[in-house]
């Protein structure tokens, strides 16, 4: 092996070693609220629409972001807003704009129930770059698991908004269970 090849291989080995040693922050999940508009049977969070614990104030969250900013490249850290249900926050677009202004790409995990075309447009204007939508089965099984009669319609509406937007990275998150496993092929 010639010296150039050895040099390139050694540089690559060192790069990989540094990545393992440094383990750079790439994703930051923020559970932005404990409030939720559905009552999922499988949920591990203590979320309800009437939770008494207040949401973390936007200013406190942005202070946390500002404290890590000197130590990371914001463009390489995806901030993912989850909950509860992040759409329960009336200041979500403001938070997104502030993340975007600071150079952070941001996304969210949602059940889609509270998503409207207007809200979607507002979030996209605030810099929303990715979205995961919970979609757990066809109508009856999704409604059963989410414990809300309009849960399926909300998820489908949100998926359609995302699918029509070529600039958004999106996916669906499915909790497969004994009732929905036979529906997977049809859900594709």
Model-derived features with residue positions:
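Conserved alpha-helical substructure of the radical SAM core
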Residues: 2-130
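Alpha-helix N-cap and loop-to-helix initiation/capping positions
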Residues: 53-56, 60, 146-154
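Residue-level signal for the nucleotide or nucleotide-sugar donor/cofactor binding architecture
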Residues: 56, 90, 150, 179-182
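Generic alpha-helical structural signal
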Residues: 62, 66, 93, 153-156, ...
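Conserved radical SAM core fold
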Residues: 86-87, 112-117, 132-148, 178
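Structural beta-sheet core signal
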Residues: 108, 133, 172-174
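Short, hinge-like loop/turn segments at secondary-structure boundaries
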Residues: 124-127, 149-151, 188
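Conserved strand-turn element in the central/C-terminal portion of the radical SAM core barrel
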Residues: 158-183, 187
């Amino acid at each position: 092996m010639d010296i150039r090849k050895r040099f390139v291989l050694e540089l690559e080995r060192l790069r990989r070693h540094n990545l393992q040693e440094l383990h750079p922050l790439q994703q930051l999940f923020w559970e932005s609220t404990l409030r939720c508009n559905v009552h999922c049977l499988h949920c591990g969070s203590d979320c309800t629409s009437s939770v008494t614990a207040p949401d973390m104030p936007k200013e406190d969250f942005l202070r946390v972001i500002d404290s890590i900013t000197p130590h990371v490249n914001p463009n390489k850290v995806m901030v993912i807003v989850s909950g509860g249900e992040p759409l329960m926050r009336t200041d979500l677009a403001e938070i997104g704009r502030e993340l975007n202004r600071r150079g952070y790409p941001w996304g969210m995990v949602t059940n889609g129930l509270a998503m409207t075309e207007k809200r979607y447009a507002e979030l996209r204007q605030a810099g929303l770059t990715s979205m995961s939508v919970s979609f757990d089965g066809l109508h009856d099984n999704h409604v059963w698991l989410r414990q809300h009669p309009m849960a399926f319609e909300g998820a489908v509406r949100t998926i359609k908004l995302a699918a029509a937007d070529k600039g958004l990275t999106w996916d669906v998150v499915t909790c497969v269970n004994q009732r929905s496993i036979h529906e997977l092929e049809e859900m594709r």
